[in-house]
Amino acid sequence: MSDDASTPAAERIPNKGKLAKDLNEVIRYTLWSVFKLKDTLPEDRAGYADEVQELFDQLAAKDVTIRGTYDLSGLRADADLMIWWHAETADQLQEAYNLFRRTKLGRALEPVWSNMALHRPAEFNRSHIPAFLADETPRNYISVYPFVRSYDWYLLPDEDRRRMLADHGKMARGYPDVRANTVASFSLGDYEWILAFEADELHRIVDLMRHLRGSEARRHVREEIPFYTGRRKDIGELVAGLA
């Protein structure tokens, strides 16, 4: 179940209720994988991006979708690029991850952070569907982070949690251009939820995150780092721009 009645208002989509009902029946795993360069890449990078793009094309034919590759360089000292992918099964994503690491580019990278999650219907707002699952157009920028609720959050009365999440969602209504992806990761790693915000303007994510700091629901968050933020680029542009 998604913890999120707290995400920005959805775009106006015809038959949105039916769409949400259908998509809530879908099991779809998603994975964010962050890497850093072991060393600077050689000046001659011929084949680095082509090999990865060929792999991505092969994966797409098996229903493994690469939603984006992202340039994280400079926003953190310990990360250079991130891949966001999703598939029907966790096994498919593990296979894709390992196939990528066997490429020339993959061998030049060191894993930094990788976390898997999947969509579960929202407890209090079943119409909330992650943007990736609704097949919305990917935006230019992304900010991904995990979070863990307080120990007493799940013991609170339903009406209290419903109210706090509804208030949190109302605070985000002024940011409909920031698309949310909140997915469950219980037992898949060290976190309960993974959240990815997408927007065409980076400052909109910054402003939304700052604004939501004022919500009552924030009292019930005990972990929400690390953050991985960057620009979406095709793999050729990304490789060309790396150090």
Swiss-Prot record:
Keywords: Heme, Heme biosynthesis, Iron, Metal-binding, Oxidoreductase
A GO BP annotation: heme B biosynthetic process
Name recorded for this polypeptide: Coproheme decarboxylase
Names of required cofactors: Fe-coproporphyrin III
Active site feature: 145
Pathway: Porphyrin-containing compound metabolism; protoheme biosynthesis
Annotated gene: chdC
Enzyme class of the recorded protein, top EC level: oxidoreductase
Gene3D superfamilies associated with the record: Apc35880, domain 1 (3.30.70.1030)
Catalytically driven reaction(s): Fe-coproporphyrin III + 2 H2O2 + 2 H(+) = heme b + 2 CO2 + 4 H2O; Fe-coproporphyrin III + H2O2 + H(+) = harderoheme III + CO2 + 2 H2O; harderoheme III + H2O2 + H(+) = heme b + CO2 + 2 H2O
EC number: 1.3.98.5
Function: Involved in coproporphyrin-dependent heme b biosynthesis. Catalyzes the decarboxylation of Fe-coproporphyrin III (coproheme) to heme b (protoheme IX), the last step of the pathway. The reaction occurs in a stepwise manner with a three-propionate intermediate.
